[in-house]
Regions:
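Sec-dependent signal peptide recognition
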Residues: 2-9
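C-terminal motif of bacterial Sec signal peptides marking the signal peptidase cleavage site
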Residues: 16-17
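GH16 jelly-roll
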Residues: 20-22, 41-42, 46-351
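Short, low-complexity, disordered segments immediately C-terminal to signal peptides
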Residues: 22-41
Length: 351
């Protein structure tokens, strides 16, 4: 009996001791709120940022020509004679006319009218009705020799692509001759909005092989010289006796998404001589054509026009309007599309 009391007292003392040690603690206070964090822009791939929109791909759903070559052997053409007089003879255009400088050759004879206004497209012009795009362009041409009749004429002629889109601006490529001095060629591409045009350009004296200029900028302001792969080839061989008014030459350029190559051939059987192979990089940021290479279809044309600002190099006085109906001869003009490049553009643009 005594042992039972002893066990009871021991258990009571143990419970009392444990009860004193197991005093419940008050609940812990809540943690302080975290400081606000700034939202960091990201790429939208799990980092909590906003997705950066992809740049818009300029696109217009237009009819683009298949391959063609117009040799002007007939009085009519599938090409358009710009601003031609309707219902009567227009002395500015004579298709299938015997050449004044080559035997057994019929040409498109284009005569500039002293009454024509100033500017591209204001003089005689043969131009596609629909559009052309990435591809190879060429024309066999001869410009007039005006140096004895009017040495300070301000007139340009050449092979062009040109269009103005209301949203995206200008798409233009020029292979130009300025007839006050037909020993030089003027190569250029044009993008941007009217009044804010961007250009890349190269001027070459083909009679000597001298590259006079290779630069980029706005319509009338140089931003810098082009170097490295944008200035290739860095030298050009002279073409002995080159004079665009003395004989026909074949002028051309190849237009691709990443490059434009201007070239010349002495005749139908000769190899192309590369005058400029421009490979694009960002020259004009925050524009639809940052590389300076046009990105939209345009119209292909041969044109003869008066300009008081497109001066022949070193001839600042050569800006007079034409005093006589000087003639330009076009033997043929041709276009071969780079269809794979055009199809890729269509596929991307319609997404």
């Amino acid at each position: 009996m005594r042992s039972r009391h002893i066990l009871f007292l021991a258990a009571l003392l143990l419970a009392t001791a444990c009860g004193e040690k197991y005093t419940p603690l008050p609940p812990a206070p809540p943690p302080p709120p975290l400081p606000p964090t700034e939202e960091v822009p990201g790429d939208g791939e799990g980092d909590g940022g906003q997705e950066t929109p992809e740049p818009e791909i300029p696109f217009k759903d237009v009819t683009i020509y298949p391959e063609f070559k117009e040799d002007f052997s007939e009085s009519s053409s599938f090409l358009r004679f710009a601003a031609k007089v309707n219902g009567g003879e227009d002395f500015r255009y004579y298709s299938a006319h015997p050449s004044l400088s080559a035997t057994n050759t019929k040409v498109m004879m284009m005569r500039i009218d002293p009454a024509d206004g100033e500017g591209w497209g204001k003089g005689p012009q043969v131009i596609t009705k629909d559009y052309t795009f990435y591809g190879s362009y060429s024309a066999r041409m001869r410009v007039p020799d005006i140096r004895k009749a009017q040495k300070n004429i301000g007139a340009a002629a050449g092979l062009y692509v040109h269009d103005i889109d209301e949203k995206y601006g200008v798409s233009g490529i020029d292979f130009e001759l300025r007839i006050a001095d037909p020993t030089k060629v003027y190569l250029s591409a044009w993008t941007g909005k009217e009044g804010e045009l961007n250009r890349i350009s190269r001027t070459i004296d083909l009679a000597t092989g001298k590259i006079i200029d290779c630069s980029y900028g706005t319509d009338d302001t140089e931003k810098g010289k082009l170097t490295d792969e944008q200035n290739a080839p860095s030298t050009v061989s002279a073409i002995n006796g080159f004079d665009a008014s003395k004989q026909f030459y074949i002028y051309g350029f190849d237009w691709k998404p990443e490059s434009i190559t201007w070239w010349i051939r002495l005749n139908d059987n000769s190899e192309k001589v590369t005058l400029w192979e421009f490979k694009g990089k960002e020259l004009f940021p925050d524009t639809y054509a940052p590389s300076g290479i046009p990105v939209l279809p345009a119209h292909n044309a041969t044109s003869f026009w008066h300009s008081s600002s497109r001066l022949a190099h070193g001839m600042n006085s050569a800006k007079e309007a034409p005093k006589y109906p000087f003639e330009m001869e076009i033997d043929w003009m041709a276009y071969t599309p780079f269809q794979d490049e055009i199809d890729k553009w269509k596929e991307n643009g319609k997404k």
